[in-house]
Amino acid sequence: MGEINALSCVGQDDVVSLRIVCTMARDGKQHNLEDVDMYGNTALLKACYLGRFECARTLLEFGANIFAMNYFGQNALTLATYAGHLTLVKELLRRRSYKDFNLSSMIPALCVATLQKHSALVAYFTQLDSRGVQETQTVHGLGVAELRGMIKAAGRLDKRNVRSPPTFISNRLR
């Protein structure tokens, strides 16, 4: 059996053990809530990515770093948005502003919600910052309208399910 730490507790959705680990970390006993996995995710980031609300809330109660970012430039809000977890998104926004989260991420939460087709989150983020929707862009300069266009184009291609003509390598007669 592997080492028990905050990351493994989140991975197993074990809130009871996580609470024990958090208590030990707070008391300075051999545990660190900010340890990272191979992607640079802290336990809080992993909980957000997996949509584990109780784990995330426990970590936040014990002072997990809400400003953490993984190696891909994703923060807690973008990962909770990716998971499509509105309740978790609201919990995070009680502790840090929407604008501040978006300024620290390569892809703003609204763009993530748009790409993942999480309409409830798109509506929620639009309501939070209705004037900023037109200005919201990824670091690549793609706005919400462009992302929606890309999704529609991809959907049309999927419906056609266009196959490329057989080539020498893919020819079944070979």
Curated annotation (Swiss-Prot):
Summary of the function given for this chain in its UniProt record: Inhibits DNA replication early in developments. May bind and block the action of a replication or initiation factor.
Species this chain originates from: Drosophila melanogaster (Fruit fly)
GO cellular component, one term: protein kinase complex
Disulfides per UniProt: none
Protein name: DNA replication inhibitor plutonium
Sites bearing Phosphothreonine, chain numbering: T167
GO annotation terms (biological process): DNA replication; egg activation; negative regulation of DNA replication; regulation of mitotic cell cycle; single fertilization
Annotated ANK repeat ranges: 39-68, 72-103
Range of residues in the leader sequence: none
Keywords from the UniProt entry: ANK repeat, DNA replication, Phosphoprotein, Repeat
Gene3D superfamilies: Ankyrin repeat-containing domain
Top-rank taxon, per record: Eukaryota
